[in-house]
Amino acid sequence: MANIVSNEKTYRHTQKVRKENHAKMSKLRTIVKKTRSSNEQAQLNEAYKVIDTTASKGVIHKNKANRLKSRTAKAFKANLQVVA
């Protein structure tokens, strides 16, 4: 651990941000998994919202967000065709 006060504060802040980012990523993964096996349009819209929010907060890159949305929509559409 750091011996300088400002470094200790930075360490505490970093740990706090790390926990927040981990929670956001966990929520993102959970909703994407649920959406891919779902057949409700509202679920897909919620996934888009979470993905965009996570990207805007800087947790994931915007290109990764777009890729996730595309792949989630593709899996969602395939699931709809199987159910129908």
Swiss-Prot record:
Pfam entry (one): Ribosomal_S20p
GO terms classed as biological process: translation
InterPro entries noted in UniProt: Ribosomal_bS20, Ribosomal_bS20_sf
Keyword Protease: no
GO molecular function terms attached to this record: small ribosomal subunit rRNA binding; structural constituent of ribosome
Domain of life: Bacteria
GO cellular component, one term: small ribosomal subunit
Gene3D superfamilies in the cross-refs: Ribosomal protein S20 (1.20.58.110)
Residue ranges, annotated region (Disordered): 1-25
Known role: Binds directly to 16S ribosomal RNA.
Family, similarity comment: Belongs to the bacterial ribosomal protein bS20 family.
Protein name: Small ribosomal subunit protein bS20
Natural source organism: Ureaplasma urealyticum serovar 10 (strain ATCC 33699 / Western)
Lineage: Bacteria, Bacillati, Mycoplasmatota, Mycoplasmoidales, Mycoplasmoidaceae
